[in-house]
Amino acid sequence: MKTPEAILTQTVEQLEKMNETLGALRRELLPGQPRKFAILAESPLEEIRRLQIEAEQLTAAIVATVPA
């Protein structure tokens, strides 16, 4: 079973990849094709939001296990 720290590391790596994907779309499609960019950016943006929530939850879980 993976530790919360290992899962958080993986989540952060996935966030970085999604940000790179979004940046590549931006470089490829903007400013020339803003509508196409908006459509294609939806999925990476949703995934980024999901991963951010996951990272917040994992961070809270890690902090909760640290003795005061």
Language model features with spans:
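Short, charge/polar-rich alpha-helical segments
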Residues: 1-16
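Residues on one face of amphipathic alpha-helical coiled coils
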Residues: 10, 17-20, 24, 50, ...
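Short E/K-rich amphipathic alpha-helical oligomerization segments
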Residues: 16-41
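Short, charge-rich amphipathic interface segments used for partner binding and complex assembly
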Residues: 34-64
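Domain-scale macromolecular recognition modules
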Residues: 66-68
